[in-house]
UniProtKB/Swiss-Prot annotation:
GO terms for cellular component: cytosol. The lineage of its organism: Bacteria, Bacillati, Bacillota, Bacilli, Bacillales. HAMAP family: MnmG_GidA. Keywords: Cytoplasm, FAD, Flavoprotein, NAD, tRNA processing. PROSITE patterns: GIDA_1, GIDA_2. NAD-binding protein involved in the addition of a carboxymethylaminomethyl (cmnm) group at the wobble position (U34) of certain tRNAs, forming tRNA-cmnm(5)s(2)U34. It comes from Staphylococcus saprophyticus subsp. saprophyticus (strain ATCC 15305 / DSM 20229 / NCIMB 8711 / NCTC 7292 / S-41). This is tRNA uridine 5-carboxymethylaminomethyl modification enzyme MnmG. Homodimer. Heterotetramer of two MnmE and two MnmG subunits. It is found in: Cytoplasm. Disulfide bonds: none annotated. Belongs to the MnmG family. FAD binds at residues 11-16, 123, 178, 367. Its cofactor is FAD.
């Protein structure tokens, strides 16, 4: 007899984990199926979490009640805040992970989660009736029934590893690929593309000459992704920086014909922002060297990840390359790098909830949707889990807008514009990045996480206390007048500021570019009384208030366009005067509102005007009828 669940998640990578946990935490009886229970939360590529934009996604997942932030906080070997010399909109955390410890911790979280079962099994078929998902069937014939299914298969769908002139069926890190499920999706009529990614060699730490490299330590202050973390890992391991050189490039040039990238062996499209070393050599042949970061894979292993040396060159050529790199001349290669090709769905086949348009109650998240990166996968996973549970429970779906979160930017880009290469989230993709900062992810999303039942009462009470403290401190500073005495003038002039002519409110003084919250306390002759994150919010919100308000005004304009809904079943062939390309793109994407329609590539302002007139005429006709 088939077992029954509310939601089934296929895959236990970074998307699958957040999907399964979100579904379970919303109260849905959830099953997670994975090819290998020992590879839950495996990091097949770089041993890190975070970075520009991506680190903010991790904070957003945490604010919604997800898991990635908490787990990396417990298992990292190093953490750094990036872009500290720039404005708050581009600051982000990046952590080096202990890969094995991360997996162990995440597996324990999953096993301990109420409402979540986990089972080893390979899904071969989707059980579908009348274009509605009903369950899944494994390769040994076991059936599991459910009201919703989330596919989070990463790079396993028809995966093929390529190394030199060798190509063989495989998932990442030489695991079993998923062939039958890939065939099943193609047979259902989904539009599929082939993408490619790669990984560099790993070398033995005992054989590296670190004296020829530059040390890259973590921050010497406690850092955390999760807003709940209170204990910090200060015993950190450094990374190391080295470079390729002319000799390295000569090895690549001599053997370029052996690279799967250039021999025609690889057909899939690779990631623009994480190219292989041979691709960097060809595309940037004027550069005398390229950075390589040596990243330990954990505290209890000698494996070191050579970040920046991703390659599909044969194993013997990889060894030759390593011999030319300062510090790695005598390094033992423990694992060779490789490229991997896999199937991905064209993401314009999805609704904003990540439900497929073709099959009702079937959701997809992660690399199957054309993205790259653990964080992008996890961000999609939590939203798919939230919405699959909502569908089963008859609750409202949840869609994050581009002004709500980087997760909203990511999903909107995918479903509206699609992608012809593995999609990487960048700060530059967000038009409201001053609103979507690392520091305010909790202020943006904790209310929603609480409404969804994924934030505890205790955590929500602490959050509300923080929010109240921020407001109270702003009001307090706005009620204190600073007099221009000699001591105050000296403090201001020491920072390069102009002297005060008259008294000024402390909050107004904080708006000056040279002033900080610390200096305001010094001027007021006060000591620190508030948590550092509260002080940070007071300073950022005050200094950037004008810019933030301008962004909020833009958001309001877009929201008015979002209120102009477009019927899902609108026949664009009946909309006169639309350009042919616009008509085709609109029919493919099926935008839910005018704002989304305006972001579709190939749809210009004239098309939007025509669409608006058509919709208004339709309303008038319905009223008259």
């Amino acid at each position: 007899m088939a077992q029954e669940y509310d939601v089934i998640v296929i895959g236990a990578g970074h998307a699958g984990i957040e999907a399964g946990l979100a579904s379970a935490r919303r109260g849905a009886k959830t099953l997670m199926l994975t090819i290998n229970l020992d590879n839950i939360a495996f990091m097949p590529c770089n041993p890190s979490v975070g970075g520009p934009a991506k680190g903010i996604v991790v904070r957003e997942i945490d604010a919604l009640g997800g898991q990635m932030a908490k787990t990396i906080d417990k298992t990292h070997i190093q953490m750094r805040m990036l872009n500290t010399g720039k404005g708050p909109a581009v600051r982000a955390l990046r952590a080096q992970a202990d890969k094995v410890l991360y997996q162990q911790e995440m597996k324990k979280v999953i096993e301990d989660e109420a409402n979540l079962d986990i089972m080893q099994g390979m899904v071969d078929d989707l059980i579908i009736e009348d274009d509605v998902i009903k369950g899944v069937r494994t390769n040994i014939g076991t059936e599991y029934w459910s009201e919703a299914v989330i596919i989070t298969t990463g790079t396993f769908l028809r995966g093929e590893i390529i190394l030199g002139n060798m190509k063989y069926s495989s998932g990442p890190n030489h695991q079993l690929p998923s062939i039958s499920l890939a065939d099943n999706l193609r047979g259902l009529g989904f539009e599929v593309v082939r993408f490619k990614t790669g990984t560099p060699p790993r070398v033995n730490a005992k054989t590296i000459d670190y004296s020829k490299t530059e040390i890259q330590p973590g921050d010497d202050v406690g850092r955390a992704f999760s807003f709940e973390t209170t204990e910090y890992i200060l015993d950190q391991l450094p990374c190391w920086l080295t470079y390729t050189n002319g000799d390295t490039h000569q090895v690549i040039d001599d053997n370029l014909h052996l690279s799967a990238m250039y021999s025609g062996m690889i057909k899939g499209t690779g990631p623009r922002y994480c190219p292989s070393i041979e691709d960097k050599f060809v595309r940037f042949n004027d550069k005398p060297r390229h950075q390589l970061f040596l990243e330990p894979e954990g505290r209890n292993t000698n494996e070191v990840y050579v970040q920046g040396l991703s390659t599909s060159l044969p194993e013997h050529v990889q060894r030759q390359m390593l011999e030319t790199i300062p510090g790695l001349e005598k390094a033992d290669m423990m694992r060779a790098g490789y490229a991997i090709e896999y199937d991905a769905l064209v993401p314009t086949q999805l609704w904003p909830t990540l439900e497929t348009k073709k099959i009702k109650n079937l959701y997809t998240a992660g690399q199957i949707n054309g993205t790259s990166g653990y964080e992008e996968a996890a961000g999609q996973g939590i939203m798919a889990g939230i919405n699959a549970a909502a569908r089963v429970q008859g609750k409202d779906e949840v869609i994050l807008s581009r002004s709500d979160a980087y997760i909203g930017v990511l999903i909107d880009d995918l479903i509206t514009k699609g992608t012809n290469e593995p999609y990487r989230l960048l700060t530059s993709r967000a038009e409201y990045r001053l609103l979507l900062r690392h520091d305010n992810a909790d202020l943006r999303l904790t209310d929603l996480g609480y409404e969804l039942g994924m934030i505890s009462e205790e955590r929500y009470a602490r959050f509300n206390e923080k929010r109240a403290m921020i407001k109270a401190e702003q009001e307090r500073l706005n009620g204190i007048r600073v007099k221009p005495n000699d001591r105050v003038q000296e403090i201001i002039e020491a920072q390069g500021g102009s002297r005060l002519k008259d008294g000024i409110l402390a909050l107004e003084l904080l708006r000056r570019p040279e002033m900080t919250y610390d200096l305001i306390l010094e001027i007021l002759d006060e000591s620190h009384q508030l948590p550092s994150d509260v002080e940070e919010q007071v300073e950022i919100q005050t200094k950037y208030e004008g810019y933030i308000n301008k962004s909020l005004q833009q958001v309001e304009k877009v929201k008015r366009m979002e209120e102009k809904k477009i019927p899902e079943d609108l026949d664009y062939s009946k909309v006169d005067s639309l350009a042919t390309e616009a008509r085709e793109k609109l029919a493919e994407v099926k935008p839910l509102n005018i704002a989304q329609a305006s972001r579709i590539s190939g749809v210009n302002p004239a098309d939007i005007s025509i669409l608006l007139v058509y919709l208004e005429q339709g309303k008038i006709q319905r009223v008259n009828n």
